[in-house]
Amino acid sequence: MDDIQKEAVHPLEAMGISGEVVQAFNWMGFHNLTAIQEKCIPLMMDGHDIIAIAPTGTGKTLGFGIPMLEYVNLDDSSVQEVVLAPTRELAQQIADELTNLAHFIKGVKIAVIYGGQPFGKQMSALNRKPQVLVATPGRLLDHMQRGKYSPRNGAYDGARRSG
C-alpha cells in the first residue's frame, strides 16, 4: 500500500481557476461550490454566455465573479467588465463581494457607481482606471451622457433582476 495520500483538488482548481481566486474563495469562508456555481463557472470559463436564475443567497455573485476575474487583463487599465445592478444596495454588495474575491490578485481595481453618491467621488473611482465596474443603470447612463464613461471597451457580464 502506498503511504502517499493524494490531496484532494479544490473544485475551483479542477476548473482551471487561479490560485489567487481559490485562496480568496477560502479566505471568504467558502469551501464548497453551490449548485449555481458548479453549473455556471465551467460554462463561463469556456466562453459561453449564460442566463441563470437562482434564489437569493445561492452564490450567484461568485458564480459570475470568479470567471469574470479570471478574464481581467491586469495590463489593461480600461473597464473590461461591467456588472449592472438594479439598486444601490445590491451594487455595493456585489462590489464588496468582488473586491473580497480579488483580495489576492495584485493590480485588479473594482469601482462601484450608483445614485445618491457624490458625482466627484465616482469620478475619482473611474479615474483610478478600474478593470471592473459595478453600477446601477441610471448612474451609468448619467456618466455616459456626461462623457465620463464610454462602454466601447466594456464587456456585458451580468444582470440582476429585483423582486
Segments and roles (model prediction):
Residues 19-30, 76-148, 152-156:
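Conserved nucleic-acid-binding Ia/Ib motif block in the N-terminal RecA-like helicase ATPase lobe
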Residues 37, 49, 60, 80, ...:
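Short, cationic motifs built from Arg/Lys/His that form the positively charged side of catalytic pockets
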